[in-house]
Amino acid sequence: MAWLADYWWIILIILIGMLINGIKELRNVDHTRFLLNKPKLPPHRDNNDKWDNEEDDWPKKKP
């Protein structure tokens, strides 16, 4: 771990460079074009649909 104490500044420069490159790439993302050409989601599959029509076992609420 002595090398970490000697070369901590190199690791810091690499991390700052990665952060700056990430910010640059995020600025290049065109969110409006993505929203206009957004892929359709498949329909939601309801796994409980066969039980929805049956009566519930819960007691009825009294008015």
From Swiss-Prot:
Principal location class: membrane
Family: Belongs to the UPF0370 family.
Transmembrane residue ranges: 3-23
Keywords from the UniProt entry: Cell membrane, Membrane, Transmembrane, Transmembrane helix
Classification via InterPro entries: UPF0370
Protein name per its UniProtKB record: UPF0370 protein ECA1289
Region (Disordered): 39-63
Membrane topology term: Single-pass membrane protein
NCBIfam families recorded: PRK13664.1
Localization: Cell membrane
Stored Pfam families: UPF0370
HAMAP family listed in its UniProt record: UPF0370
Disulfide pairings: none
GO cellular component: plasma membrane
